[in-house]
Amino acid sequence: KECMVDGTVCYIHNHNDCCGSCLCPNGPLARPWEMLVGNCKCGPKA
C-alpha cells in the first residue's frame, strides 16, 4: 500500500497512511478537530 508523502493533508480516516507522521499545528487537544477540518499534513516521522 502506498503511503502519503509529506505535505499531503491527513484526516482521521487516513492519518495512518502518511509515510511519516500526521502533523497538526495546535497540539494534541485540538488534533481530532484539526484532522476533521483538514489542518493536518503528513510530515517527517515524529
UniProtKB/Swiss-Prot annotation:
InterPro entries, sorted: Insecticidal_knottin-like_sf (IPR053718), Toxin_28 (IPR012633)
Expressed in which tissues: Expressed by the venom gland.
Family annotation (Gene3D superfamilies): 4.10.40.60
Paired cysteines (S-S): 3-19, 10-22, 18-42, 24-40
Annotated Gene Ontology cellular component terms: extracellular region
Pfam families (UniProt xref): Toxin_28
Similarity comment text for this entry: Belongs to the neurotoxin 16 (SFI) family.
Domains as described in the record: The presence of a 'disulfide through disulfide knot' structurally defines this protein as a knottin.
Protein name: Mu-segestritoxin-Sf1e
Organism (species): Segestria florentina (Tube-web spider)
